Amino acid sequence: MNFRAAGRLVLFCLKVVVTIFSYLFTAAFASKETKRLARAAWLHRNSRRHLKTFGYTEGISGEIPKRGLLISNHLSYLDILAISAVTPAVFVSKADVRRWPLFGWFAKLSGTIFIERERRLHVGEVNTEIEKALATGALVVIFPEGTSTNDETILPFRTSLLEPAARGGHEISVSWLHYELEDGDARNEVCYWGDHTFFPHLLNLLGKRSVRATLRFAKFKQITDDRKELAKQLHAAVLNLKCENEVLTADYAD
């Protein structure tokens, strides 16, 4: 562990203490009807503070959604903070995230809807929770790849959590996330995938000078109520944002 990583880890932990007090004085005592929105707002207020610990900066394009469904690619444990720093949101995440140090704690307190994919009946319960969150006017973020990747490609989207989208009646947006490191390889040192283990990965990332995120947003026009076809169309929409960014980057380099 280098000095930068050690110092930032201490700073991160101190910020966690501040965040706990912030939660106790805001979202913890919200009414049942407003608690989900209050938790999303709490994470929104605190995300940027924690991202700064990583030397984090961002570039944003497109219309930032405020409600409805947001469908995004998934790269890292930073994704929830990165999106939440831009707009208050309720996240849908795999149950494993609950066990991540610190970030799992953030996820639980912010009202994340956890899914246990090995339990087939649990998907229906999760879709019901998504509908409840949407009914409150929340923005619900889904990562339909089902896992995080190294940003080389976007995995085919799973259809199980797209039932609320297929039913219609909700605004749908798509987003694409991308990270860059000034002094490293973002695909292995920011993206959290494969055989990486959490704490060594986090310490290494804290030791980097800075992390740069790109977030691209776009509205999605739903033209089908078939989940499989919808999954393909949403995948194509997110992939299009990735390809647009690569074209812009290439043009800039020229």
Give the location of each predicted region:
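Short, low-complexity, charge-dense intrinsically disordered segments
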Residues: 250-254
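Residue-level preference for the first positions of well-ordered beta-strands
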Residues: 67-69, 112, 137-143, 171
